[in-house]
Amino acid sequence: MIKAIIGKIIGTRNDRWIKQYKKQVLTINALEPTYEKMSDDELQNAFEELKKRVRSTEKDLQEKTLLEVLPESFAITREASKRILKMCHFDVQLIGGMVLNDGKIAEMKTGEGKTLVATLAVALNALKGESVYVVTVNDYLAHRDSKEMEPLYHFLGYSVGTITASVRDDDERLEIYSKDIVYGTNNEFGFDYLRDNMKYSLEHKVQKSHAFAIVDEVDSILIDEARTPLIISGPVDRRMENYNKADEVAKSMQVEIDFTIDEKNRAILITEEGIKKAENLFGVDNLYKIENAALSHHLDQALKANYLFFIDKDYIVANNEVVIVDEFTGRLSEGRRFSEGLHQALEAKEGVSIKEESQTLADITFQNYFRMFSKLAGMTGTAQTEATEFLEIYNLEVVSIPTNLAIKRKDLNDLIYKSEKEKFDAVILKIKELHDKGQPVLVGTASIEKSETLHALLKKERIPHTVLNAKQHTKEAEIIKDAGLKGAVTIATNMAGRGVDIKLTDEIKELGGLYIIGTERHESRRIDNQLRGRSGRQGDPGTSQFYLSLEDNLLRIFGSDRIKGVMEKLGLKDGEHIESKLVTRAVENAQKKVENLHFESRKHLLEYDDVANEQRKSVYKFRDELLDVNYDISAKIAENREYALNQIFSKLKAFDHQNLSEEELLGLKNILKEDFNAHVSLEDLKKASPIENFVAEKLKSDYENKMKVLDSEQRSRIERIVYLQILDNAWREHLYTMDNLKTGINLRGYNQKDPLVEYKKESYNLFLEFIEDIKTEAIKTFSKIQFENEQDSSDAERYLDNFSEEREHESVTYRHEEALDEDLNVAMKAFAKTPKRNEPCPCQSGKKYKDCCAKSGPKKGLFAK
């Protein structure tokens, strides 16, 4: 109450921001007459002067200089837009541009010209000479926006490029990223960052800096997509028959007897009866024994697939494949797969071919990718409901920009029916009424399944209509553009053509504009607001109303009993509804509960990913150092050699290494031969004094003699490439181990331990192990390098010539590793292959290598006779 009173007196924080920006608008407008009088050449020269001024400033002071030149830059950009695009930035659009430049989120309603607003901040920040990224949700918008704005940017002396999934050629991508302004999707930018950190040359990295990015539809990308990490992966061996068996077992189990469903948390809890049934069907005595861990995991995923995930809602089956439907946009997520074996479980459920599970080679969340930018800004029509999350996670403030014209759309109260059938009957009646009148109507549904239901009902009533869901996503822009035509009836899932305007004729405006019908409240208020926002653009008339039922998921799972109680007291007859602000508020409270659950889920994901992110940054930084031709890789190898020898001598019993027994010396001799390909006699070891210096000098001289056939450039390149391969392989194994750790860490909660604290502690220890593994593996590999012909360097030349940089998402990444091993065999011959940490130990103990000889040395031992 007090806060509201103070707000009315001094204005809200948003009001105060807008007031400050309006002062700048006056300054910009005062410059307009000056630039209007200039010729094109004079205007371009004036902008070039701004570039020189900013770029001649010290880097640390460039942001300050940008603020100083902002009025001139905005005024020139506006004048150029008038001449080139025949579009003039409104005052509110100038405010939007300033919000973006300040690294904030500009909340602008549909039709307010966000694409044009972005040009102001883009043109200003590109003055620094670093590429500016404009991020969109799909290839269509990236291509459309870049092509529409390109003439303006060219006039200002900027080059423009567009990154889409269709750009496959590495050289072409490199060329596009060299442009001043780069448009692209969040997925492409994120994957390119991961691919950059799998490259073997700094010159081949496409993203040179992360200076400034403007994220269009920022709520969709930074909120809705935040729970889905970007992953580049390669296949991993799994027994495919386990998925089908687990699916059979899951289908035979009964709800409430063998398992219970927690719909709020989307979880399955197996009962004691269910465990016994599963053990009987799998033919095992204890489902939760370590050796049956894979079976219990497959069963968990099969139960989720069968009882929590539904066809035409969470996924569709197309071309013998299970394709995910994005829950927020309603679009098909081509190429994306559910993790942890869930996708395979869905494939088994639907009887399509099961694709093998994959192992992570590189991954990052959008949260951590976009937080790398020195300055980040965003645009959307709906951000205030998530303002807390934007601030807490991304340090982004949300500023609501006033509309250019007052909003005339009427947002009516929700109508609530007892059953879904009654609700849809009422929706059909309303559509028929509007269609007969000629007023266009856009009907929003929460899933493909519901859009198909509505389609069938309209077909039965012979009402012509168009359906837009994930199955027709290729026609999205065309369908949405036509949604404002006279008599048009359009059914759309959540996708509803974001970024595509629905323009109305004067005749349609006279009829009342576009009528929005929502057939279900989404879990997020923001998605509902997006649907409403399709109507009433640029001061157009319009109406929106939601039709709900007590059988809707949101009300059934999260809605309070209060709504149900009200309806029962009123004694509503079939087909009757209630309409009240009290009920609408209760629905919004249910939405807030779900939004909070999702926020906590995203925060939880980020807390875990932050741990991995620190490790990722450390590894990628070291990787860049290795790629630098000035980095002293030979010194790093010498350092690793010293470390490896210290590890060996630290295991020797005797404190005084000069008094080693013959048994110990023999053990040392064997280790030197097996691990370092160093041939020393027992007599030499006995005579050596001090023995550590003798061994160190022996390993060093062997290596230097081997590398004599190479010139300094060849040697440096060979050493860097081999070291990079060792690092990449170790990182891949580390990610695999981290995935396994994360999968089981929540079980620590049953032992009264905080899973996150345990994860941080164990992941830190794993990272230390990872670093040690690199050091020891590096020196072993370099010690075993042997050129086929030690009299010339042709093998090395052949290796360097054949070394391929081709990487293309998952499969190419995996193929590249196979090709790399083959090339290494052409140029070098290793005398022994050290098993990977998770491979079976060669001593045939039955344990993994990391739990056996990796710790204690080979079974014949350091002190073997």
Swiss-Prot record:
Q: Which organism is it from?
A: Helicobacter pylori (strain ATCC 700392 / 26695) (Campylobacter pylori)
What lineage does UniProt assign to this protein's organism?
Answer: Bacteria, Pseudomonadati, Campylobacterota, Epsilonproteobacteria, Campylobacterales
Q: How is the cofactor bound?
A: May bind 1 zinc ion per subunit.
Q: What's this protein's name?
A: Protein translocase subunit SecA
Q: State where the protein is found.
A: Cell inner membrane; Cytoplasm
- Which GO biological process categories is it annotated with? intracellular protein transmembrane transport; protein import; protein targeting; protein transport by the Sec complex
* GO CC entries: cell envelope Sec protein transport complex; cytoplasm; plasma membrane
Q: Which reaction does it catalyse?
A: ATP + H2O + cellular proteinSide 1 = ADP + phosphate + cellular proteinSide 2
To which protein family does this belong?
A: Belongs to the SecA family.
Q: What does this protein do?
A: Part of the Sec protein translocase complex. Interacts with the SecYEG preprotein conducting channel. Has a central role in coupling the hydrolysis of ATP to the transfer of proteins into and across the cell membrane, serving as an ATP-driven molecular motor driving the stepwise translocation of polypeptide chains across the membrane.
SUPFAM superfamilies in alphabetical order:
Helical scaffold and wing domains of SecA, P-loop containing nucleoside triphosphate hydrolases, Pre-protein crosslinking domain of SecA
The alphabetical list of record keywords is: ATP-binding, Cell inner membrane, Cell membrane, Cytoplasm, Membrane, Metal-binding, Nucleotide-binding, Protein transport, Translocase, Translocation, Transport, Zinc
What membrane topology term does the record carry?
Answer: Peripheral membrane protein
Entry binding sites for ATP: Q93, G111, E112, G113, K114, T115, D501
Enzyme class label = translocase
Which cofactor names does the annotation list?
Zn(2+)
Per UniProt, Zn(2+) binds at: C841, C843, C852, C853
Query: What EC designation does it have?
Result: 7.4.2.8
- Which Gene Ontology molecular-function terms are recorded? ATP binding; metal ion binding; protein-exporting ATPase activity
